[in-house]
């Protein structure tokens, strides 16, 4: 049975801003996760002249059942892409830049060196802070080290859901491997802020969400995002429930009590939604 979408999840799309930003990105030959994942905040973010750049193409090597990004055989890396991302950030006047990627299990380092090159290019821009949302690199510690040594301000890696639902929601991923990545970042450089996020509405319980929060705090994760899972198409896993704004507020309060420096919890919250604000609050 299909669960009806509530009023609090209906958003107005600002088509003029959307069209303008999409034309700019097309001209720069760049992808955003905003477009590839059909993000509900795309109109608002594009109106604010912010976007999350998605590097290493727009085809993923995994088949997570919640994700709208295309699956298949990716193209070779574009060596000029890191420079173009930095140029786009400069032209848009961005002060905080978020970079993510598809998962590239076909590459020896999972694309870590490409992330590092992009971070180095962005760090050339005066006063710019950089946040990266990385895949799990199949647990490759050298790959994680490569990204850490490029010194982004924030390294985000989403655990996405509670452990019980992994086999159904993201069968090629591993909950412990994801926790270990975030733990390794802190071991290598305690000054880098770490961040993770989950979707709710997939059939998890409140107790399971709280356990994930505790697991993240146990590895000194600084920031957390919690948002509603929205089904991209009939091919994707169904929504089990639409979590109320009141429950999201409760998760936020619990997160702060557990010691997170910043918690963004709401129906439309996504990993990089108002990430600049999150960084500022986390730094105090």
Curated annotation (Swiss-Prot):
Recorded metabolic or biological pathway in which this protein acts: Protein modification; protein lipoylation via endogenous pathway; protein N(6)-(lipoyl)lysine from octanoyl-[acyl-carrier-protein]: step 2/2
Reactions mediated catalytically: [[Fe-S] cluster scaffold protein carrying a second [4Fe-4S](2+) cluster] + N(6)-octanoyl-L-lysyl-[protein] + 2 oxidized [2Fe-2S]-[ferredoxin] + 2 S-adenosyl-L-methionine + 4 H(+) = [[Fe-S] cluster scaffold protein] + N(6)-[(R)-dihydrolipoyl]-L-lysyl-[protein] + 4 Fe(3+) + 2 hydrogen sulfide + 2 5'-deoxyadenosine + 2 L-methionine + 2 reduced [2Fe-2S]-[ferredoxin]
Location in the cell: Cytoplasm
GO cellular component: cytoplasm
MF terms (GO), sorted A to Z: 4 iron, 4 sulfur cluster binding; lipoate synthase activity; metal ion binding
First and last residue of the signal peptide: none
Domain Radical SAM core stretches: 46-261
Binding site for [4Fe-4S] cluster 1: 34, 39, 45, 272
Co-factor(s): [4Fe-4S] cluster
Residues that coordinate or bind [4Fe-4S] cluster 2: 60, 64, 67
Comment on bound cofactor: Binds 2 [4Fe-4S] clusters per subunit. One cluster is coordinated with 3 cysteines and an exchangeable S-adenosyl-L-methionine.
Record bears the keyword S-adenosyl-L-methionine: yes
Top-level enzyme category: transferase
PROSITE patterns the record matches: RADICAL_SAM (PS51918)
Keyword terms: 4Fe-4S, Cytoplasm, Iron, Iron-sulfur, Metal-binding, S-adenosyl-L-methionine, Transferase
EC number: 2.8.1.8
Protein family according to the UniProt entry: Belongs to the radical SAM superfamily. Lipoyl synthase family.
HAMAP family the record matches: Lipoyl_synth
The protein, known as: Lipoyl synthase
Organism of provenance: Caldanaerobacter subterraneus subsp. tengcongensis (strain DSM 15242 / JCM 11007 / NBRC 100824 / MB4)
Gene expressing this chain: lipA
């Amino acid at each position: 049975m299909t669960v009806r979408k509530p009023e609090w999840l209906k958003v107005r799309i600002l088509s003029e801003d959307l069209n303008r930003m999409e034309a700019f990105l097309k001209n720069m030959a760049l992808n955003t996760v905003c477009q590839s994942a059909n993000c509900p905040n795309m109109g608002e973010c594009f109106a604010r002249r912010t976007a999350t750049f998605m590097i290493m193409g727009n085809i993923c090597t995994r088949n997570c059942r919640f994700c709208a990004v295309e699956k298949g055989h990716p193209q070779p890396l574009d060596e000029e892409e890191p420079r173009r991302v930095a140029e786009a950030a400069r032209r848009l006047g961005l002060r905080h830049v978020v970079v993510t990627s598809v998962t590239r299990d076909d590459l020896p380092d999972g694309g870590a060196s490409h992330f590092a090159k992009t971070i180095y290019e962005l760090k050339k821009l005066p006063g710019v802070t950089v946040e990266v949302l990385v895949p799990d690199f199949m647990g490759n510690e050298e790959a994680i080290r490569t990204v850490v040594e490029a010194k982004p301000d924030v390294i985000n890696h989403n655990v996405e859901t509670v452990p019980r639902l992994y086999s159904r929601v993201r069968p090629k991923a591993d909950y412990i491997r994801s926790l270990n990545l975030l733990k390794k970042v802190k071991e290598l450089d305690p000054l880098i802020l770490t961040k993770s996020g989950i979707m709710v509405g997939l059939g998890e319980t409140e107790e399971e969400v709280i356990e994930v929060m505790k697991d993240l705090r146990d590895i000194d994760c600084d920031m957390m995002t919690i948002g509603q899972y929205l089904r991209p198409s009939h091919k994707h896993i169904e929504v089990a429930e639409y979590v109320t704004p009141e429950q999201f507020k409760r998760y936020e309060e619990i997160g702060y009590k557990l010691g997170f420096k910043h918690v963004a919890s709401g129906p439309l919250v996504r990993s990089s939604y108002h990430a600049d604000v999150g960084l500022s609050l986390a730094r105090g």
